[in-house]
Amino acid sequence: MLPAKYSPKDVESEIFKFWEDNDIYRKVKEKGGRKFYFVDGPPYTTGRIHLGTAWNKVLKDTILRYKRMMGFAPTDTPGWDMHGLPIEVKVEQELGFRTKRDIESFGIDKFIERCMNYALANKDAMTEQFKSLAVWMDWENPYMTIKAEYMNAAWFAIKRAHERGLLERKKMVVNWCHRCETALADAEVEYWDEEDPSIYVKFPVKGEKDTYIVIWTTTPWTLPANMAVAVHPSLEYAKFRAVKDGKVEYLILAKELADSVLGKGDYDSWEVVETYLGEDLEGLEYEHPLADEVPLQKNWKHQVFFADFVTAENTGCVHIAPGHGVEDYELGVEKGLEVFNPVDDRGVYTEEAGKYAGKHVKEANDDIIDDLYRKDLLLAEERIVHRYGHCWRCKTPIIYRATEQWFIKISELKDEMLEEIDKVMWIPEWAGSARFKDWVSNAKDWCISRQRYWGIPIPVWICEKCGEMKVVGSINEIEWENDLDLHRPKIDAVTFSCQCGGVMRRVPDVFDVWFDSGVASWGSIAYPLRKDKFEELWPADFITEGHDQTRGWFYSQLGTSVVCFDKAPYKAVLMHGFTLDEQGRKMSKSLGNVVEPEEVVGQIGVDGFRLYVLYSAPWEDLRFSWEEARNINRMLNVVWNAVRFAHTYMSLDNYSFGEKGELKIEDRWILSRLESFIKEANEAMEGYQVHRVVRAFFDFFVEDFSRWYIQIIRPRVWEERDSPSKLAAYYTMFRVIDRSLRAIAPFAPLIAEWFYQHVVKEFREGEESIFMEEYSTAEVEMIDGELEAAMKVAKEIVEAAANARNKAKRKLRWPLRELVIESGSEKVRKAVEMLEETILSQCNVKQVRVVDSFEKEIEIKPNYKYIGPLLKEKAGEFAKYVASLKEIPEKLVFDGVELDPKQAIVVDYRLPEGYEYAEFSGGVVYIYKELDDELVREAFAREVIRRIQEMRKELDLDVEEFIETTVEMDAELVKGWEDYIKSETRSQKLVFGKAEGYVREWNIEGKKVKIGIKRLRG
């Protein structure tokens, strides 16, 4: 007999040991099968896994297990992203470093070694965490971005870009982290609200006394680098005569924004002097507001240009600093402006910044504002809270600065990338057609260089003498004296001789870490060093990651793949959501709302955790709820009890699967539902919609099998051993359990394996593991849609009858004389005809009949809570209208307002004496609640039976054990039902007299009843 309660811990420890002792994973893999190329999106080895990474790997494992059971041999190489700022920043924190100079003082070689060790240690720890979630991957042979064969794949990609003219070194404005002292990709910038200065500045117009162009900025520190002002060509601008404290100024800004702006400047009055379009302002010269503080600015001419990116916001006049803004830079290049960037890698002003040299840009804001105020050029000053970008790893606010960087010309590949997106299967569809396409459509050239240490070195060597460039595309192009290590600083020592006689040295940059993972589809199989697997497998059949990867891994893979092969590197992509707290907030230590995977597993087990995260539609964010998680565990307990029930009786009777008996209608129904569930699972998994399978499983196994079918067939398992009816029930239950387990095994592998070993293989021969079995595929010929529809109606009738019983205060154990179903539906009539026996037994009534109309009076009243807000003063008229109705109309429109009839109208039935009612979708059920003497005796017998069965449980009696029962009560109360009591309680003797043995006193319907039971040995 199976344990009475489901213990996830016991099940899991046993199965983990079984898998390990018997090398099950290897044996499953050895079965082989059709090719299925899966590429694992590599997580950063920065610490412990969190709820999101756990969900991600469970999702992948589920699909891989499914594919294996479907006859595929999927690649299951786990990946690890082990380079980049994610690792560097963690190691810097461990070492107490604050700047790059700390790293160089420590020694680049030693820092690289620490990064390597940190990444490897975390990889090992995270591997154990993933394994504890029953994730089957080839953990002994992962792909790691730190391996030479993988780094070679990135070198191959950059060489292809160079050969195609897509690799370019140029000066561009990029996101810059001044703490990490490196460029960042757009995908590496995280945004949140931050408070900054908000200032309105007057730029003096050249040659016009007391005349100014008014600009607005939240980055005063960029003003030393100002080179121009931009206006929109078709926006209306005006020169205002403004008066403050008797002094007159002339201010140029967008006409429609003047009241707001000049109001902030505390002007007493203002009036329009002149209006013009933005294009009329082009060429207007002004004096730099900080020319005295930044003397270099006196060397350049400053003027107004028009630009389409200017909007009618703030002042309509935009301060342009080509060295500190992307659009500014583009306009500067177009107009031939100086790209002035007097800020170094640390975010500190250089000597070119004049007065501000040596100050950090953010710290200089106040000094600049003070200087503007002193020169009477500060029109207004405020504080603003706005979304601002921060470094994704160290969380420092970024700055924008123009620097020399290496770029892939994505702008030249964009059309091809968009075409490739259309060839991919996206789940959900809009992940590709909307979200990803939008991102790619707006993508700029990809800055692939980083000014850091721990990464794949960019394989570009440049001659110190003539500037000749060499791009290395393979590690085979380098002669190595010692162990092959492509990392800095060893690679920096490699030089080449140039034809000019000079020495070629490697550029100091490393790759953007997204370039690392971008080559995963071929780097993970060591292409181009080894070509066999690539030719057999590439491109990937399937990948899945979170929705942030539309700008991350999905994008970097597509870009590198189109560069190298003019083709998308994946055929199908499932985009999943993020894990949030119950309020929809991101989990963070600062909010104190972090839930660790181990915490969840500790409460509901590994399978409970897996089923919980897989229950939600994967592309939706998962709002973690402890109550919902525990509900999954409750449902697993229902599954356990259902399997235990079946196993108990089949085991007692030494059942062997194959003996079919005579299937009854409820057997045919549940077998039909089984195949419908499996059909749903098959279709869902082909579309990678895992949540549909989990939901369908619980709906079928918990609701249909456990809470309905088993309740119907309970009396049949007490029949004689060779009863055809009992054999049919056994056949049906076993088939349901066997096929359901194979359908849910990829999702809940531990409990499925446990049941397979302890239940399935007891009644039929099987494989060594459930994962060597084939996944269940639907036998559609067994699906009876008409029967399923009829049973759905029957269940509704039974539920409605239970509601009517509640109203009548009649327990289900108390039999009733009659159930009347009022319905004009042929579907209902046919269902009752087909399933009369089921309805009678589950409603516990003696007879059931269907009528078109039941004798009653109907009172129809308005539901004022619903109609009040909709009809207001017309509610009284509606009440009069409703009073005239004889029945509820299908459609209801009153005074031009469409109402829901079921909500707008309340129906009250006045029934014949002794009846109670309840509604269901197909009509109304009526029960006759009055009890005659015969029904009372039967009801009392059922109450006695329930108490005896409870006492059997308390004595922990086996199901088949016989007892002797003594009852102290008036025997007349159960007269005629003695044999029924004996049969239902396995009592060989039933004596009315002094209670003996194990005795308990009960209160049954106000009567004291003493019951004694004795175990009969023999």
Swiss-Prot record:
<dbReference type="GO" id="GO:0005524">
    <property type="term" value="F:ATP binding"/>
</dbReference>
<dbReference type="InterPro" id="IPR009080">
    <property type="entry name" value="tRNAsynth_Ia_anticodon-bd"/>
</dbReference>
<protein>
    <recommendedName>
        <fullName>Isoleucine--tRNA ligase</fullName>
        <ecNumber>6.1.1.5</ecNumber>
    </recommendedName>
</protein>
<comment type="subunit">
    <text>Monomer.</text>
</comment>
<dbReference type="InterPro" id="IPR014729">
    <property type="entry name" value="Rossmann-like_a/b/a_fold"/>
</dbReference>
<dbReference type="InterPro" id="IPR002300">
    <property type="entry name" value="aa-tRNA-synth_Ia"/>
</dbReference>
<dbReference type="InterPro" id="IPR023586">
    <property type="entry name" value="Ile-tRNA-ligase_type2"/>
</dbReference>
<dbReference type="GO" id="GO:0006428">
    <property type="term" value="P:isoleucyl-tRNA aminoacylation"/>
</dbReference>
<dbReference type="InterPro" id="IPR013155">
    <property type="entry name" value="M/V/L/I-tRNA-synth_anticd-bd"/>
</dbReference>
<dbReference type="GO" id="GO:0008270">
    <property type="term" value="F:zinc ion binding"/>
</dbReference>
<dbReference type="InterPro" id="IPR002301">
    <property type="entry name" value="Ile-tRNA-ligase"/>
</dbReference>
<dbReference type="GO" id="GO:0002161">
    <property type="term" value="F:aminoacyl-tRNA deacylase activity"/>
</dbReference>
<feature type="short sequence motif" description="'KMSKS' region">
    <location>
        <begin position="586"/>
        <end position="590"/>
    </location>
</feature>
<keyword id="KW-0436">Ligase</keyword>
<dbReference type="Pfam" id="PF00133">
    <property type="entry name" value="tRNA-synt_1"/>
</dbReference>
<dbReference type="InterPro" id="IPR033709">
    <property type="entry name" value="Anticodon_Ile_ABEc"/>
</dbReference>
<dbReference type="InterPro" id="IPR009008">
    <property type="entry name" value="Val/Leu/Ile-tRNA-synth_edit"/>
</dbReference>
<dbReference type="InterPro" id="IPR001412">
    <property type="entry name" value="aa-tRNA-synth_I_CS"/>
</dbReference>
<feature type="short sequence motif" description="'HIGH' region">
    <location>
        <begin position="43"/>
        <end position="53"/>
    </location>
</feature>
<keyword id="KW-0479">Metal-binding</keyword>
<keyword id="KW-0648">Protein biosynthesis</keyword>
<comment type="function">
    <text>Catalyzes the attachment of isoleucine to tRNA(Ile). As IleRS can inadvertently accommodate and process structurally similar amino acids such as valine, to avoid such errors it has two additional distinct tRNA(Ile)-dependent editing activities. One activity is designated as 'pretransfer' editing and involves the hydrolysis of activated Val-AMP. The other activity is designated 'posttransfer' editing and involves deacylation of mischarged Val-tRNA(Ile).</text>
</comment>
<keyword id="KW-0862">Zinc</keyword>
<feature type="binding site">
    <location>
        <position position="589"/>
    </location>
    <ligand>
        <name>ATP</name>
    </ligand>
</feature>
<dbReference type="GO" id="GO:0004822">
    <property type="term" value="F:isoleucine-tRNA ligase activity"/>
</dbReference>
<keyword id="KW-0030">Aminoacyl-tRNA synthetase</keyword>
<dbReference type="GO" id="GO:0000049">
    <property type="term" value="F:tRNA binding"/>
</dbReference>
<keyword id="KW-0963">Cytoplasm</keyword>
<keyword id="KW-0067">ATP-binding</keyword>
<dbReference type="GO" id="GO:0005737">
    <property type="term" value="C:cytoplasm"/>
</dbReference>
<comment type="similarity">
    <text>Belongs to the class-I aminoacyl-tRNA synthetase family. IleS type 2 subfamily.</text>
</comment>
<keyword id="KW-0547">Nucleotide-binding</keyword>
<dbReference type="Pfam" id="PF08264">
    <property type="entry name" value="Anticodon_1"/>
</dbReference>
<dbReference type="Pfam" id="PF19302">
    <property type="entry name" value="DUF5915"/>
</dbReference>
